């Protein structure tokens, strides 16, 4: 098999000979497909967010892929003649442009070979066997030559001076505009405890992160089709590492407060964009030395950037616990394992790897770039369940060559990145749909067989990629940086080769494992002879949008998120369906057609496979998914990453999902586990830890109880039509209106404050926010009495006399508002009297008390010292009647009765019934 596949691209002195496998000379790939015209509509058909009618797609492409491709990747202004209307236009625009440049650059042995390459690449793309990263679809063949940015990933650098810091922001803006993302390590910037050369103290990297985050948030990546993407890295020995660890978690508390106040906290909402540090992923760079210090509970120095002196010493384990605690709260920061990363570095003599792209899969030298592409693994599964090695290796050859050609004519945001991209020519070939493939094969994601299959496929992909790289180098020469890094690069190749022979033979089908090992044997041998055209070959990217383009069930290396999904229908609307890989798995496991139909119907009804008729208990692990009742453990995620990592040039973009009940210790253990198992990076997500959560599972998944939390409160929204009462008030020289909306039972559920201050003034904004917060609290069940207790007699300007005889004097606007609400919605006369609210009932009571003095033994008499328990004393002890003082002694200007509980809560004396001021207690 492997020998036949190796014919895909032979090398001659003139260039590469391209064999056809997916196409036939003289027959265009488009002619082998059935096509149809559809409408691409996103959102409500009556008022769609996007609409393009009459677009042409292959019949095999789903409506979901149609909508996403038309909206994201078709170029040209909607409604204009230039607007693309067919997948044929989009695919040919890219494939033809790459082939054109390949011809001109001498990659092909003949025109026929160039034609074969064009046809094979077109076939691979239009049949959803592979896809390039988004910038290729955005720019290639559409932008003018010299402006065709094809890379999705960039790594930048920054020095410890203002010019460099400001330049960093400019570079990022250019990258985001082109539809790409970037990462940077800020560890060269001195900490906030370090002095400046001309006096004063440095701002520190976290302060500069604020500005960069806002800048990123203001730029829609790719002309408004994607959010800007950033990665910020800080070394674990930086003086500001603790500030860095907590910066996002602290902002997440703000997001939670906004959500509690009923602000829209979706990822693109105005409220969410006000929360800082949300446009970047944060990662801490840790070394083996630090991780060993954590394991041994040793001290760890945070050192100055200027002279290397220790500024602060902490416990390494405490620092790791802080990282885990912050990640528990908000999923950041992640971890990057610096020593491991640089151990597998092919170009260490040029410089170390200090950072990554936003998703942590591309790791290379500073000021460098990588263009990505991904293969759809399910397209290489034969009907009998075997893996089609020949098709896969051929696709690797074609797509890898296309990526290599892209490097040469792609544009780059800076001169330094341009030089490094063309000198090192880093590529990022990867795959998607691994989770679906494993399920279809009847293999649990968390199993030794599943990990062995994933490792073998990854080994084959990277070995074949470097084999192709060496073939290209035989014609064009190796990459410019190869000579100075030759021994290091070749040593890393041997490390990959050795890892391929560590996969257990009995766990993988022989043709696949044989091809994987043979590809590495050939890659190492050819590299020793010719060198390599590319410093890096593969990564495992998240394949977000392009996985939908390829109609993948799962992204990157991820398992299935849920067994049920919603399919967009061609005529509009949605239909709930069971993932196709479920039925394939059941077939592989030997279930009959009728049994599969029963199980399928059960999943559709219950949104889970647990309890399905005819399903054997031993097969349940095959259907474990990322979240839900039978979710894959975090160790299962980490073990899968560890199976693939030895065969990748870069790293793996993957989220390790943990349930909401996971603890801080679980996260710290996961970070340690990732280090021990040889990962390059690890990101954790505890379910529910983000205020704006991007992806939800199906409604049928049972929610586990929150860790150490009470059930979440429910909001009792106001009816559409409700009664209200509006009250005009004045406090000092300030006037305004309070409107209180009522539930059908007459209780208050919302307040509005109007005409308080000028439009746009601080006081108006604050009072509007105050009213919103109070309204939300009332609707979530906070008792009005609690608000009244908290805000009554709160003192600040404006304060003064009012025109309300019930509340003659107010210490502040919240004081007046709360006491007025109490006067209208609280019937407890004692309570109102204790607040100095002189309602008619309170005045009548006072007059009655003065006219008919009560006996001291009545329990809560008018001596001003009652504790509310009926004993007539302040301390709760009963005084003998013989010693009781006559009640008439206390009747002159008797202050309002203050129940002991209320007095203790307010810690104030009763109010004067003339001016409303709180009197000082004298006994």
Regions found by a protein language model. Name each.
Residues 1-779, 788, 805-807:
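Extended catalytic cores of very large enzyme megasubunits
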Residues 5, 9, 77, 698, ...:
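Residue-level detector of intrinsically disordered/flexible regions characterized by low predicted structural confidence
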Residues 46, 281-283, 359, 482, ...:
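Intrinsic disorder/low-complexity detector
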Residues 505-509, 842-864, 902-905:
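C-terminal regulatory/linker segments that are acidic, Ser/Thr- and Pro-rich
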Residues 636-661, 728-741, 746, 858-923:
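C-terminal accessory/binding modules appended to enzymatic or scaffolding proteins
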Residues 675-700, 807-857:
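Long, highly charged low-complexity segments enriched in Glu/Asp and Lys/Arg with interspersed Ser/Thr
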Residues 756, 760-840:
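Phosphate-backbone binding interfaces of nucleic-acid-interacting proteins
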